[in-house]
Amino acid sequence: MEPPTSHVTNAFSDSDSASVEEGGADADADVEALRRLSDNLAAAFRSPEDFAFLADARIAVPGGGGGGGDLLVHRCVLSARSPFLRGVFARRAAAAAGGGGEDGGERLELRELLGGGGEEVEVGYEALRLVLDYLYSGRVGDLPKAACLCVDEDCAHVGCHPAVAFMAQVLFAASTFQVAELTNLFQRRLLDVLDKVEVDNLLLILSVANLCNKSCMKLLERCLDMVVRSNLDMITLEKSLPPDVIKQIIDARLSLGLISPENKGFPNKHVRRIHRALDSDDVELVRMLLTEGQTNLDDAFALHYAVEHCDSKITTELLDLALADVNHRNPRGYTVLHIAARRREPKIIVSLLTKGARPADVTFDGRKAVQISKRLTKQGDYFGVTEEGKPSPKDRLCIEILEQAERRDPQLGEASVSLAMAGESLRGRLLYLENRVALARIMFPMEARVAMDIAQVDGTLEFNLGSGANPPPERQRTTVDLNESPFIMKEEHLARMTALSKTVELGKRFFPRCSNVLDKIMDDETDPVSLGRDTSAEKRKRFHDLQDVLQKAFHEDKEENDRSGLSSSSSSTSIGAIRPRR
């Protein structure tokens, strides 16, 4: 006979077993319920077309989705998930005395949301989408390949610029919105890949970690130590980082004996004077400083400095002095072309190549200029479709230019069959060149502008191709009438023809794809009017396509001219997510 206690023990054992099973089932049910809640809330953000009527705010992202975009959001969800956003919405509601907006609610500019840091870190459309998606769903989705992968087929996409920049943008947005768990997650991810990050990209991470401050102290300390021990020069650091961080780097390098107390790692005063002259866009002052004989352009690494920090016009003027070795290396082993590949400015790259820069030269770690450019370019920018007549992305254009330069097979000979057929007819040659370049400006605006700037077309007199009509007053002094009879070649005609011819030659050399398209149009034996009446379906389609492109370009130019006069060119292009300091 079993003791009485055995029955009690068995009863408790059976009860415990049942409760464990029930507890497991309850846990599974809870997980499933949370998953459904996550999916349902995420759908409100991921499917704006279905939930637009519920959205009561929108966040405007400059440059998002290719040309700027708004993300529809719901203030109640964001306020519940982010203390920072709750404060933003509360202040705006109080200021508006409880009034609401119409047609999707109030509109918030992302840069205003990010405060002062938004001027230094450009948080992209996809990075903000990931942060907002996390606020809705509580889960981190897959990183978007178009924004996180570079176009170098040999890259592991762990520490390349697109991957690092994307994580840094998410980290900064999450920290600003006070989303602690997402901030910690992306801080850990960056810490895990720091050893694989190229030294130039460390500045980007250091800048973001410094802005995040206390929420990213581990990342800040480790990144700061790596920059201190790196071969990054003080000029580059000074242009990229705030003064308080520069002081920490100088103090650390002094304590480690990496720099001398006399110059603290900065170049001597003669070199600094040349750099300041370049910052002032004063190449004539640079020439005067060189006559003092204290230094030269190569010792001052003036071309490197101009390419990295100055307007493209200054680089061109400096090259025209013909006083610097265009293939000179800086202490880190970078040629001027390597720096230009990081800058990603097509005009600068073409200017260097036309002056003899060697695209096959490699850095100390074995990278050519084209590979540097590829490691900086996002797949979304490179493989994205560009609408005809719209500017090509600069990143893609730089890669195409460098690849073409490596092939060393520019198309030779006349611009096309039509120009060769013009023979000795100077008027015909001028008309051809003017028409070809004008068509290139419409169909391939970015490529045409690069070639025209280097050929200095803007410094010549534009031909009046009209039928005797007087040009507008503002253009009378900048046009030359080709309809004069008899036509006599003048000095201004020759200058214009030389510049236009060089434009076409540069197009042949660096933009063969575009040149082939122009060849097919310009070499058509039939004029456009008869082409429009042609019964051939293919030719009629080609005519109408061309007509649409020209008409669209005309209307866009007219609208732009109505809005404003001349547009000024931008000065310096930032590398990555961090805006350069001046």
Curated annotation (Swiss-Prot):
Domain BTB: 55-140
GO BP annotations listed: defense response to bacterium; defense response to fungus; extracellular ATP signaling; induced systemic resistance; negative regulation of defense response; positive regulation of DNA-templated transcription; regulation of defense response to bacterium; regulation of jasmonic acid mediated signaling pathway
Keyword hit for Glycoprotein: no
Protein residues bound to salicylate: 436
SUPFAM superfamilies found in the cross-reference section: Ankyrin repeat, POZ domain
GO annotations of cellular component type: cytoplasm; nuclear body; nucleus; RNA polymerase II transcription regulator complex
Subcellular location: Cytoplasm; Nucleus; Nucleus, Nuclear body
Highest taxon above the source species: Eukaryota
Biased composition (Polar residues): 1-18
Record comment regarding domains: The BTB/POZ domain mediates the interaction with some component of ubiquitin ligase complexes.
Cited function: Salicylic acid (SA)-binding substrate-specific adapter of an E3 ubiquitin-protein ligase complex (CUL3-RBX1-BTB) which mediates the ubiquitination and subsequent proteasomal degradation of target proteins.
Family named by the database record: Belongs to the plant 'ANKYRIN-BTB/POZ' family. 'NPR1-like' subfamily.
Assembly mode: Oligomer in an uninduced state; disulfide-linked. Forms activated monomer upon changes in cellular redox potential. Interacts with TGA2.1, TGA2.2, TGA2.3, LG2, TGAL1 and TGAL4. Interacts with NRR, RH1, RH2 and RH3.
Protein name: BTB/POZ domain and ankyrin repeat-containing protein NPR1
